[in-house]
């Protein structure tokens, strides 16, 4: 870009940077280039303009043309030669300019600006080209010695990066030129280039301290070394970097083959062609020739130099560990064939540094809990400690298929039950203390289900239920497992029995023998006594039963089919319940009217005293009939007082089952007083009121008094005003026309004869 440097006189100070496409006026007042304290300077003394003469910005040999035009009174001098007023002149770098006749002297210089972009996307390249164009520079794709900057978003080791480091050129971000352009336009201080260095994006060398600034040591890094390339593509790609570093690059093929001593000379580095790489396409005959050279080097104790070591030697500024045929290869970094460049048009590999070294050791992700054992990931892989919990999960995953197979193949019901119980006992983990209350709750719930089952046994099964097709039909494996589990729950969760109940149990067992040797007997005498006591206490716990009825219905429905099957299987062994059930039927008949009254009270809030009296009379009549049928009911009533003392020990959360008929028994229970059928003394029961409207009490009018509203009164006045103004305007025009006609009349006044 062009710069106007003050040489002497009152125009001293910072240089003026000239952007392309902008006219810079040199003058005394209100100018871009202001020269004060010089009386020979005009207000618009001269104009400087820089423009490109070619459209191709890649032509680095063409620089922008800077033209100077003189508009002054006292003249402008270029190299002590006065310019003609009103004419332009092309300037060259190094020309001296004197404005006026005094000491306002300047010098013109051109500062080269050639930016080479690498690894930029399309939008980044477009923004870079626009900024470089305004600054008067060029953008190129391939690195040359004329390049002044390497533009990268993040530093990746490519051929361009190596060449820029060897040449000592700065590597900057694209934002540097954007900020530079803004600073020139606003005449502010230029940005510091150190703050626009891109970060290093090479995982293999990211942890090491790397100096990517311009160092003089890199310019002679390969001095005294000769790099032998056995492949034309490698030579074309890497020869420029070797030459920039002071070395010599030679291409050796089968046609111009040298002697073996040439490859063994000191300072000679044979570049590895990477024939083991599948991406490198080399003919078989050439592979044999290359392999013979590699075998010769190996016999002499030498090694080929990988491509990556050329870049590493430049980055770390040493050839002791890199590019040494007699030394050992570097163990810190793996050297593989690099990937292709993003900016070169040729299909050659540009990137020298590999990605992160691939380790074949597989590491397991840390997905365990905090209590689980942890492990460290270091340079050398260690054994991974697996927690006990994870081992148990693995044991369970192995045992699960065997359990499923046993469930499918077994046909015996006992084996099916054992398998299902085995599935429940598979988790052998130690339970935490927070889970123990839930287990206790499950036990209490099981005991409540057992008590509920005993109450359900109190009622006979309804005859409306569907009968089984076959009495001795084999049960399915799932149902047998459920029966076995329910039996185990009943046996394990039976509640404690009071002493009073135990005495009565012994009394009943002496009077009525029971078959206790049967295997399927699930309901003992204790259950029968508890059902009798529970039935006696139903009237006292009716309110609590209603509140818990909905909650228990969900738990009881699960056991319906199991209980129904058990009732059929245990029919011969439960003959003792026949007598008790007959007595309980009488009690049920006696209590049903009372329960009906209570349920009617809960559902209807507006109960009438007359309906309650009728229900009480029916209840008293039924009680007299029941007294004559059995004596056990009266004994039970006398025992209610004793049972009230033990009401605390009675089971709670029981299920109340009622058998209701769909026929309305008490038709007089409806409230006749709630409906008043006599409308004789009442007025019209309609609550709305007719709204009066204009003309409601008169004859209908098509157009009536208040319906007429002067809607267009305002519009008429405006129209009249407009018409009046128009008439005045027309009259005025008529008067003007008549006056004009009178001016041109020869004899406006006519004389009439008398």
UniProtKB/Swiss-Prot annotation:
CDD domains: BRCT_nibrin (cd17741), FHA_NBN (cd22667). Residues 105-181, 224-315 form the BRCT domain. The keyword Nucleus applies. Residues 326-346, 396-415, 431-475 are annotated as: Disordered. Residues 111-328 are annotated as: Mediates interaction with SP100. SMART domains: FHA, Nbs1_C. There is a cross-link at residues 435, 686, 690, 735 (Glycyl lysine isopeptide (Lys-Gly) (interchain with G-Cter in ubiquitin)). Keywords: Cell cycle, Chromosome, DNA damage, DNA repair, Isopeptide bond, Meiosis, Nucleus, Phosphoprotein, Telomere, Ubl conjugation. It comes from the Eukaryota. Residues 24-83 form the FHA domain. PANTHER family: NIBRIN, NIBRIN-RELATED. Component of the MRN complex composed of two heterodimers RAD50 and MRE11 associated with a single NBN. The MRN complexes dimerize on DNA to form joined MRN-MRN oligomers required for DNA double-strand break repair. The MRN complexes dimerize on DNA to form joined MRN-MRN oligomers required for DNA double-strand break repair. As part of the MRN complex, interacts with MCM9; the interaction recruits the complex to DNA repair sites. Component of the BASC complex, at least composed of BRCA1, MSH2, MSH6, MLH1, ATM, BLM, RAD50, MRE11 and NBN. This is Nibrin. It comes from Pongo abelii (Sumatran orangutan).
């Amino acid at each position: 870009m062009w710069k106007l440097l003050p040489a002497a006189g009152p125009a001293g100070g910072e240089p003026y940077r000239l952007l392309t496409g902008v006219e810079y006026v040199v003058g005394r007042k209100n100018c871009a280039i202001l020269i004060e304290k010089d009386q020979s300077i005009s207000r618009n003394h001269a104009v400087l303009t820089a423009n490109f003469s070619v459209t191709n910005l890649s032509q680095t040999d063409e620089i922008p043309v800077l033209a100077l035009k003189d508009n002054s009174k006292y003249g402008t001098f270029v190299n002590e030669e006065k310019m003609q007023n009103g004419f332009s002149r092309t300037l060259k770098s190094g020309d001296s300019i004197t404005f006026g006749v005094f000491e306002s002297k300047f010098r013109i210089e051109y500062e080269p600006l050639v930016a080479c972009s690498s690894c930029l996307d399309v939008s980044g390249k477009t923004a870079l080209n626009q900024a470089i164009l305004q600054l008067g520079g060029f953008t190129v794709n391939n690195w040359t010695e004329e390049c002044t900057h390497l533009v990268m978003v993040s530093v990746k080791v490519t051929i361009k990066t190596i060449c820029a480091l060897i040449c000592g050129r700065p590597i900057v971000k694209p934002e540097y030129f954007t900020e530079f352009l803004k600073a020139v336009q606003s005449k502010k201080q230029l940005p510091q280039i150190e703050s626009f260095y891109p970060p290093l994006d090479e995982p293999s060398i990211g942890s090491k301290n790397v100096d990517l600034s311009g160092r003089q040591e890199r310019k002679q890094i390969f001095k005294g070394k000769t790099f032998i390339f056995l492949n034309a593509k490698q030579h074309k790609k890497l020869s420029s970097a070797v030459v920039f570093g002071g070395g010599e690059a030679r291409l050796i093929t089968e046609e111009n083959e040298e002697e073996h001593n040439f490859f063994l000379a000191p300072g000679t580095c044979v570049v590895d062609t990477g024939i083991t790489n599948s991406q490198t396409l080399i003919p078989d005959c050439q592979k044999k020739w290359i392999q013979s050279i590699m075998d010769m080097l190996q016999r002499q104790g030498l090694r080929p130099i990988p491509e990556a070591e050329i870049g590493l030697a430049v980055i770390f500024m040493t050839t002791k560990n890199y590019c040494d045929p007699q030394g050992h290869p570097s163990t810190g970094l793996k050297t593989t064939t690099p990937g292709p460049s993003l900016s070169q048009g040729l299909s050659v590999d540009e990137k020298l540094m590999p990605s992160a070294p691939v380790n074949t050791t597989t590491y397991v992700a840390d997905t365990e809990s905090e209590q689980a054992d942890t492990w460290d990931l270091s340079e050398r892989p260690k054994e991974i400690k697996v927690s006990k919990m994870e081992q148990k999960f693995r044991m369970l995953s192995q045992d699960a298929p065997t359990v499923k197979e046993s469930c499918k193949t077994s046909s015996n019901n006992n084996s099916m039950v054992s398998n299902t119980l085995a599935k429940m006992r598979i988790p052998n983990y130690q339970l935490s203390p927070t889970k123990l209350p839930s287990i206790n709750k499950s036990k209490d719930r099981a005991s409540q289900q057992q008590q509920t089952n005993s109450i359900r046994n109190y009622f006979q099964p309804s005859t409306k239920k569907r009968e089984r097709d076959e009495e001795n039909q084999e049960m399915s494996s799932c149902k047998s497992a459920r029966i076995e589990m329910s039996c185990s729950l009943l046996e394990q969760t039976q509640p404690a029995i009071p002493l009073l109940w135990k005495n009565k149990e012994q009394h009943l067992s002496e009077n009525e023998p029971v078959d206790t040797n049967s295997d399927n007997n699930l309901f003992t005498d204790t259950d029968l006594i508890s059902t009798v006591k529970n039935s006696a206490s139903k009237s006292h716990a009716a309110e609590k039963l209603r509140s818990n009825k909905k909650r228990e219905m969900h738990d009881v429905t699960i056991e319906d089919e199991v209980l129904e099957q058990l009732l059929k299987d245990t029919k011969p062994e439960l003959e003792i319940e026949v007598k008790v059930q007959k007595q309980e039927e009488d009690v049920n008949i006696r209590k049903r009217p009372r329960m009906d009254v209570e349920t009617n009270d809960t559902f209807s809030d507006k109960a009438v005293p007359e309906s309650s009296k009728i229900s009480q009379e029916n209840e008293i009549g039924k009680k007299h009939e029941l007294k004559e049928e059995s004596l056990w009911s009266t004994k039970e009533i006398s025992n209610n007082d004793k049972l009230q003392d033990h009401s605390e020990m009675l089971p709670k959360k029981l299920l109340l089952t009622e058998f209701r008929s769909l026929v309305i028994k008490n038709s007089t229970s409806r409230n006749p007083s709630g409906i008043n059928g006599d409308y004789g003394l009442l007025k019209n029961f309609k609550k709305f009121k007719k709204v009066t409207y204009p003309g409601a009490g008169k004859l209908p009018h098509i157009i009536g008094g208040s319906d007429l509203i002067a809607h267009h009164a305002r519009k008429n006045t405006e129209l009249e005003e407009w018409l009046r103004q128009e008439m005045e305007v027309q009259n005025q025009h008529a008067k003007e026309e008549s006056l004009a006609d009178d001016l041109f009349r020869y004899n406006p006044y006519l004389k009439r004869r008398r």
